[in-house]
Curated annotation (Swiss-Prot):
Function as written in the Swiss-Prot or TrEMBL entry: Converts 3-phenylpropionate-dihydrodiol (PP-dihydrodiol) and cinnamic acid-dihydrodiol (CI-dihydrodiol) into 3-(2,3-dihydroxylphenyl)propanoic acid (DHPP) and 2,3-dihydroxicinnamic acid (DHCI), respectively.
NCBIfam families: 3PPDhyd_Dh_HcaB, PRK06200.1
Lineage: Bacteria, Pseudomonadati, Pseudomonadota, Gammaproteobacteria, Enterobacterales
The name this protein goes by in its record: 3-phenylpropionate-dihydrodiol/cinnamic acid-dihydrodiol dehydrogenase
Pathway(s): Aromatic compound metabolism; 3-phenylpropanoate degradation
EC nos: 1.3.1.87
UniProt keyword annotations, A-Z: Aromatic hydrocarbons catabolism, NAD, Oxidoreductase
Active site: Y156
BP term (GO), one: 3-phenylpropionate catabolic process
Coiled-coil features, chain-numbered ranges: none
Top-level taxon of the source organism: Bacteria
């Protein structure tokens, strides 16, 4: 039996991309899974696909009341909460400082930070009492942009660096009761969108990047699927496999940190 059997897991943005992969993986592990999802159509799809195995709540991660409503439903259903995974986010399609008009930069900043940073903070606030009671954990989705430049424009990169500070501070504030960690995936096949303020709300990340471009820059030389990143979340959630890690950020970058100066990888001819 999985370590996560009957564990109560709350994931934001579970309707597509990495969020959907996490929903699938935790259900496979036998967990009781809930998600807060903005899209009514995706909520309906989740309910149709997973039935009683999913508690799908329509709501906005920038609204504390929506979080509280979801947590109340989780506690009614499961009687507890073991892990909160803050995952919902938006990207800026590499919108640069120089080429973005000042007024758009300002409104784009507020929209992107509301989702990528405030959304995490509000989720942590709503979930903290239940997680303190269960001595559970929080996990926040980062990005390679939390470590390196060029994984987005200044708005997205700054938001992911802000999230690393949030993880460290919450890990400090909530210890010893709650473990708080992060996972930073590299580019993958997803439907990640951008801020409406930048005119990117209908533009998917895969319209800016191709599988070939992503694979070419990664030393492991493959195009990751969302499911490729679910393992670290499972490990961090498990009390048996992770008793000792808090304030840790796993850089799941397919080897990007060891990319060579002369070649992307030295073993291409092996």
């Amino acid at each position: 039996m999985s370590d996560l059997h009957n564990e109560s897991i709350f994931i934001t943005g579970g309707g597509s991309g990495l969020g959907l992969a996490l929903v699938e993986r935790f259900i496979e592990e036998g967990a009781q899974v809930a998600t807060l999802e903005l899209s009514a159509a995706k909520v309906a799809s989740l309910r149709q696909r997973f039935g009683e195995h999913i508690l799908a709540v329509e709501g906005n991660v920038t609204c504390y009341a929506d979080y509280q409503r979801a947590v109340d439903q989780i506690l009614t259903r499961s009687g507890k909460l073991d892990c909160f995974i803050g995952n919902a986010g938006i990207w800026d399609h590499n919108a640069s400082l120089v080429n973005t008009p000042a007024e758009t930069l300002e409104t784009g900043f507020h929209e992107l930070f509301n989702v990528n940073v405030l959304g995490y903070l509000l989720g942590a606030k709503a979930c903290a009492p239940a997680l303190i009671a269960s001595e559970g954990s929080m996990i926040f989705t980062l990005s390679n942009a939390a470590w390196y430049p060029g994984g987005g424009g200044p708005l997205y990169t700054a938001s992911k660096h802000a999230a690393t500070g949030l993880i460290r501070q919450l890990a400090y504030e909530l210890a010893p009761k709650v473990r708080v960690n992060g996972v930073g995936p590299c580019g993958m096949a997803s439907d990640l969108r951008g801020p409406q303020a930048l005119g990117q709300s209908e533009t998917s990340i895969m319209q800016s990047l191709t599988p070939e471009k992503i694979a070419a820059i990664l030393p492991l030389q493959f195009f990751p699927q969302p499911a490729d990143f679910t393992g670290p979340y499972v490990m961090l959630t498990s009390r048996r496999n992770n008793r000792a890690l808090s304030g840790v950020m796993i850089n799941a970058d397919a080897g990007l940190a060891i990319r060579g100066i002369r070649h992307v990888a030295a073993g291409l001819d092996l």
